[in-house]
Amino acid sequence: MVFEGHLVGTGLKVGVVVGRFNEFITSKLLGGALDGLKRHGVEENDIDVAWVPGAFEIPLIAKKMASSGKYDAVITLGTVIRGATTHYDYVCNEVAKGVASLSLQMDIPVIFGVLTTETIEQAIERAGTKAGNKGYESAVAAIEMAHLSKQWA
């Protein structure tokens, strides 16, 4: 037997957690995610968005959303751009670990849509220019994974 999710979001309830730090990028990721959800049939009133200060704070609110029983999937969006210190490494590692851990602990998909880039140009490219919009891609993944995970409910 082959299991796969389909890309119809009708009837799905989705939570989105967005880091405000680098908002000029994360707002574009959010726009892409909202566009992706709506284009695939998720109703606007079935989407809740929570803004957090930065990427490091994403896992806590994603956990609260995922454990609420209200959502079929949670999308995490943020942008971490390497600077001159090791702060980048700590933030990236902890956010990735936090979201990955939630994905395994929760009964719903928690999608990692956090950009971790070396340069601001790379972040801009992934927020809707040359390299597509990772927010949109995260929305599509959330829809597919929500349906796929329900096959084992």
UniProtKB/Swiss-Prot annotation:
Enzyme class, spelled out: transferase
Active-site residues from the entry: 87 (proton donor)
Pfam family of the protein (one): DMRL_synthase
NCBIfam families cross-referenced by the UniProt entry: lumazine-synth, PRK00061.1-4
EC id: 2.5.1.78
Family per similarity comment: Belongs to the DMRL synthase family.
Gene name linked to the record: ribH
Positions in coiled-coil regions: none
InterPro entries linked: LS (IPR034964), LS/RS (IPR002180), LS/RS_sf (IPR036467)
HAMAP family: Lumazine_synth
Protein name (Swiss-Prot/TrEMBL): 6,7-dimethyl-8-ribityllumazine synthase
Recorded GO CC terms: cytoplasm; cytosol; riboflavin synthase complex
An example Gene Ontology molecular-function term: 6,7-dimethyl-8-ribityllumazine synthase activity
